[in-house]
Swiss-Prot record:
The gene coding this protein: eno
Protein name: Enolase
A GO-annotated cellular component: extracellular region
SMART domains xrefs: Enolase_C, Enolase_N
PANTHER family per record: ENOLASE (PTHR11902:SF1)
GO biological process: glycolytic process
Known role: Catalyzes the reversible conversion of 2-phosphoglycerate (2-PG) into phosphoenolpyruvate (PEP). It is essential for the degradation of carbohydrates via glycolysis.
Family: Belongs to the enolase family.
Length: 424
């Protein structure tokens, strides 16, 4: 009754107005699952390939080739197979593609089908997606890492680092965490405006003021947390996503906004100093994706005190994660479904991290849609943390709203991760 009977893929637009792939998978019993694929602005060199058409249409960013692959070649390969056989279906698509980075069919085609299959199977089973994927133990609501100041590739301003986040660990529920985040977000808007800064928002819904340094951004956030009635370092902690690969040039870190250039060791020391000065408990991509020595230096300096998240470093790839674990590099992995391109491989990356006592953070991309699948996956995997942007833009809020619904559905079984995510 759960055999796949049809796949209908289409080209839709993401939150940046760029094309992306959406897939509907239909089953024999009438069940249907729909998934839309996100897209990143700052992408790791080792990510699975997002297939684009080239040419004049959509300035080369069309996805008709990926849509065609899903509708024809992929459907021909998996049509008739039970949707409950997720691993088999994903492996068939990976083998059908035949490349190490999914560049022939496109990770956007494969992922769209993979997620839609899981959602169709969940509907057929009468279970919410988080329960279908995660089983009876899926009950941990993640701490949101809310990106309220944007810089780097996500905004048109001088700030070198890409994201400045708040983590409301002092909340008792995800609903309360969202409220706390919203209050700080709106307080920050007033603080920025009062100082003459613009309050335009970036790709992920955070403000993109013309600040020149990380310290200036962090000072604004700390002040806003306090003015909103919360205690920095108790109710709310801070997090950074440096996206350091974006400003790593000729073996050095070029902080143009701050007017300085740092060697790897000095960059690690700078980040450790920021973490000591401010209530920072998480730094993502503090070093560049292939600067393994720099990552080791940063881990040795700060790895026992704070969470060091590998995004471009690991690209949700279990093989690269195992390399990092073996080398004692970082202590956490950022999990982006489109970096690896299938649900099975995504879950494998989370399991690999947890077995090595690394944390895992479920994450959106800067180019998103109204699809809220990652909210369910964060609960399904008991990650305990989720990155899905700021407290504005419907493409970001869709995930927060879904987490609130999941918490409501879990009732007394629901647990909010809260302070359990803090290291040291």
């Amino acid at each position: 009754m759960t055999a796949i009977t049809d796949i209908i893929a289409r080209e839709i637009l993401d939150s940046r107005g760029n094309p992306t792939v959406e897939v509907d998978v239909y089953l024999e019993d009438g069940s249907m699952g729909r998934a839309a694929v996100p897209s990143g602005a700052s992408t790791g060199a080792h990510e699975a390939v997002e297939l684009r058409d080239g040419g004049k249409r959509y300035l080369g960013k069309g996805v008709e080739k990926a849509v065609e692959a899903a509708n024809t070649e992929i459907f021909d390969a998996i049509g008739g197979i039970d949707a409950e056989n997720q691993i088999q279906i994903d492996n068939i698509m990976i083998e059908l593609d035949g490349t190490p980075n999914k560049s022939r069919l496109g990770a956007n085609a494969i992922l769209g089908v993979s997620l839609a299959v899981a959602k169709a199977a969940a509907q057929a089973s009468g279970l919410p997606l988080y329960r279908y994927v995660g089983g009876a133990s899926a009950s941990l609501l993640p701490v949101p890492m809310m990106n309220i100041i944007n810089g780097g590739a996500h905004a048109d301003n001088p700030i070198d680092f890409q994201e400045f986040m708040i983590l409301p660990v002092g909340a008792d529920t995800i609903a309360e965490a969202v409220r706390m985040g919203s209050e700080v977000f709106h307080t920050l808007r007033k603080e920025l405006a009062a100082q003459g800064h613009n309050t335009n928002v970036g790709d992920e819904g955070g403000f993109a003021p013309g600040l020149k340094s990380a310290s200036e951004a962090l000072d604004f956030i700390v002040k806003s947390v306090e003015k909103a009635g919360y205690k920095p370092g108790e109710d709310i902690y801070l997090g950074l996503d440096c996206a350091s690969t974006e400003f790593f040039k000729d073996g050095k870190y070029v902080l143009e906004g701050e007017g300085r250039t740092l060697e790897s060791g000095a960059m690690a020391e700078y980040l450790a100093e920021l973490a000591a000065k401010y209530p920072i408990i998480s730094i993502e991509d503090g070093m560049a994706e292939d600067d393994w020595d720099g990552w080791k230096a940063l881990t040795d300096l700060a790895g026992k005190k704070i969470q060091l998240v590998g995004d471009d470093l690991f690209v949700t790839n279990s093989a690269r994660l195992r390399d990092g674990i073996r080398m004692g590099v970082a202590n956490s992995i950022l999990v982006k479904v489109n970096q690896i391109g299938s649900l099975t491989e995504t879950l494998d990356a989370v399991n690999t991290a947890h077995k090595a006592a690394y944390t895992a953070v479920m994450s959106h991309r800067s180019g998103e849609t109204e699809d809220s699948t990652i909210a369910d996956l964060a609960v399904a995997t008991n990650c305990g943390q989720i990155k899905t942007g700021s407290l504005s833009r419907s493409d970001r809020l869709a995930k927060y709203n879904q987490l609130i619904r999941i918490e409501e559905g879990l009732g007394p079984q629901a647990q909010y991760a809260g302070r359990s995510i803090i290291r040291g």
